[in-house]
Regions:
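Aromatic-lined, polymer-binding surfaces characteristic
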Residues: 108
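Histidine-centered, transition-metal-coordinating active-site segments
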Residues: 1-101, 111-294
Length: 294
């Protein structure tokens, strides 16, 4: 039986041959099939969408992008898989195809984000899709869909199901918990990365290596858990998230600017082609709003 560790991206995790570097001194392996996804126009678009939007008005160095974060989550997903591949229960439950679907989902999890996505979604206006559903327009047809079929031997629907549908069985519950759960690849990356770029220590005060090293399956076998040795690291992760929301994401000046943006979008959205608007990079998005305002 083929080991999960034989997956090309996991084999290349410690390689020096083909990689890209992102802050802070993180080496991200780029296999040919990963590079084919990254080089699509849909994924490159994320390089022109900031990760934190209006937070940069308060923390001026917070100009990192969804592109950088997506690479970071992809790398974190590989670290999760490498740790869990040594768990016999995990390897019995998760096939190679499942693991590769998880790798792709981690890389593409933010594909449907548009500029200032979360504040605009929060208004709940008719005609504004969730970013998960908007991602389907990129994932189910076009170059990314072709690459998934031809290079990864995956059906695009498998990826969208993992990203946006309710898990149907324990296998999907495990994978979903690795991507969106109390301790997940997304959270471990964005807390550290956002903290680093904002110039604050709050999101980096937990032992990431210890936490990953303690990952295992829970008792029922339908999600992630941590061994006792990772308990303190997990508690520090929870506190790090709390402080990042208190001091960064929900900073009073950020919330004020967010309310102004929401008000402007509420007043102008009827004059805009939302599908076209949401496909634009951040600068063009702001220009479109400004022109609509006259």
């Amino acid at each position: 039986m083929t080991s999960l560790l034989d997956i090309p991206e996991l084999r290349e995790l410690d390689s020096r041959k083909s990689l890209v570097r992102i802050p802070h001194e993180e080496d991200v392996p780029l296999t040919p099939r990963v590079r084919m996804l990254i080089d699509t126009a849909e994924f490159r678009r994320l390089a022109r969408i900031s990760q934190l939007g209006l937070v940069s008005l308060v923390y001026p160095a917070a100009n990192h992008t969804r592109f950088e974060h997506s690479l970071g989550v992809y790398r974190m997903a590989l670290l999760f898989l490498r740790q869990l591949a040594g768990d016999p229960r995990f390897e019995a439950a998760i096939t190679r195809e499942d693991a590769e679907c998880f790798i792709v989902a981690a890389l593409l999890h933010d594909l449907g984000h548009w500029p200032f996505c979360h504040p605009i979604e929060d208004i709940r206006l008719p005609g504004v899709p969730s970013h998960e559903l908007f991602a389907n327009s990129f994932l189910l047809e076009g170059e990314i869909a072709d690459t998934l079929r031809d290079e990864w031997n995956l059906q695009p629907r498998e990826v969208t199901a993992l990203l946006s549908e309710k898990p149907r069985d324990n296998r999907q519950r495990i994978l979903r918990s690795m991507l969106s759960g109390p301790v997940d690849a997304d959270k471990l990356d964005y807390l550290h990365r956002d903290s680093l770029h904002c110039g604050v220590p709050y999101g980096r005060h937990f032992d990431q290596q210890r936490l990953i090293g303690s990952l295992c399956l829970n008792g029922p076998g339908d999600g992630l858990a941590i061994r006792d040795k990772g308990r303190t690291a997990a508690e520090m992760l929870v506190f790090a998230r709390y402080v990042m929301f208190s001091e960064v994401y929900w900073h009073h000046a950020v919330r004020s600017a967010t309310a102004m943006l929401q008000r402007a979008f509420f007043l102008l959205h009827g004059q805009l082609d939302l599908d076209q608007l949401f496909r634009q990079p951040e600068h063009a998005f702001i220009t479109s709003l400004t022109q609509a305002a006259g």
